UniProtKB/Swiss-Prot annotation:
This is High osmolarity signaling protein SHO1. It comes from Blastomyces gilchristii (strain SLH14081). The chain crosses the membrane at residues 41-61, 71-91, 97-117, 130-150. Residues 62-70, 118-129 are extracellular. The keyword DNA damage does not apply.
Length: 322
């Protein structure tokens, strides 16, 4: 089996231009099922659209009837773009990628809607007061969105919101939406990726290995060979060429292999789908909301076990402990 170190695993190597082209062609796409099947997304988007329509229609009526603050139109247009953008993000399940940007845009939108409310709510016209009510409702939805997108994926509130869509099964590949990072962190050492440390001997153990020949790796004399056999047993003493060291390396490698864990004390739930890299036998694929058994949660990659018995490593930022 080919041995990979943590820094030279195929998962971290630069992909060929063909792979990059295929990756770009498989970018995250909008899927309305992700909104319809998620009560949180469906309720917040529907409420924001109703509030926006209320403010838009009443602003048109107020503008026709008389003087109208032009700043309110900027708030109407800005919130339309914000609602469309958030709908696309929730529909493509890329909130973990654009969450920081969304919070910034929503913070500005909250300021705009608040100023629009202040300029409309104190007027005696019913249409302007209705427009202010629409902006107030939009502000309430914005506050909920800021709390959602601004929270960590591992927070209890975010996990509760994500679990609301548990009845919706996701089959799209995680590669369509996961961020590309070259500084993700080292993976845990497994049987394939473990670095084998060099075998060390003391000076007393190396006594008898000396050779009078200046050529490195020259076969020892019969006396030295017998002494080696007495010190290390028949396995080492039976070798005729110490320079090659093939048997020594194989024996040492077999004793230093990291075995698979036998206990999985933790349970984790997948908050996003993940498709394992076909070039790396250590990774495992899993679907969204799938339950995995985890042996260690200290690193960025967790050793996990599926219900089918398949074991491997999984990225920790796509799992949440339960």
């Amino acid at each position: 089996m080919v041995t990979y170190s943590a820094n030279y695993s195929p998962s971290f190597q630069r992909r060929s231009p063909v792979a990059v082209h295929n990756r770009r062609s498989n970018m995250a796409r909008m899927d309305l099922n992700n909104i319809v099947g998620d009560p949180f997304a469906l309720i917040t988007i529907s409420t924001s659209m109703i509030a926006w329509l209320l403010s838009f229609v009443t602003c048109v009526i107020s503008d026709i009837q008389g003087l109208f603050p032009n700043f309110a139109w900027w708030a109407v247009g800005y919130m339309l773009c914000a609602i469309i953008g958030i709908s696309i993000v929730l529909g493509s399940q890329t909130s973990h990628v654009y969450g920081v940007a969304i919070v910034g845009y929503l913070a500005a939108g909250l300021a705009f809607t608040s100023l629009a409310v202040n300029s409309l709510i104190y007027d005696d016209e019913a249409s302007k007061q209705a427009a202010a009510a629409g902006f107030i409702l939009q502000s309430m939805v914005i506050i909920v969105w800021i709390f959602y997108f601004g929270s960590s994926r591992h927070s209890s509130s975010r996990g509760y919101h994500d679990s609301m869509g548990a009845g919706k099964e996701q089959h799209h590949s995680y590669r369509n939406s996961k961020p590309i990072s070259n500084n993700y962190g080292a993976r845990p050492e497994t049987t394939v990726s473990a670095n084998q440390p060099p075998q060390m001997y003391t000076s007393a153990q190396l006594n008898g290995f000396e050779t009078s020949s200046p050529v490195s790796g020259f076969p020892p004399t019969a006396t030295n060979g017998a002494d080696i056999q007495n010190r290390f047993g028949t396995t080492l003493g039976s070798q005729t060429n110490l320079g090659g060291g093939s048997t020594i390396g194989q024996d040492h490698q077999s004793t230093n292999e990291v075995s698979q864990p036998t206990e999985y004390p933790y349970r984790a739930k997948a908050i996003y789908s993940y498709e394992a890299n076909p070039d790396d036998a250590n990774e495992i694929s899993f679907a969204k909301h799938e339950i995995l058994d985890v042996s260690d949660v200290s690193g960025r990659w967790w050793q996990a076990k599926k219900a089918s018995g398949e074991t491997g490593i999984a990225p920790s930022n796509y799992l949440i402990l339960i």
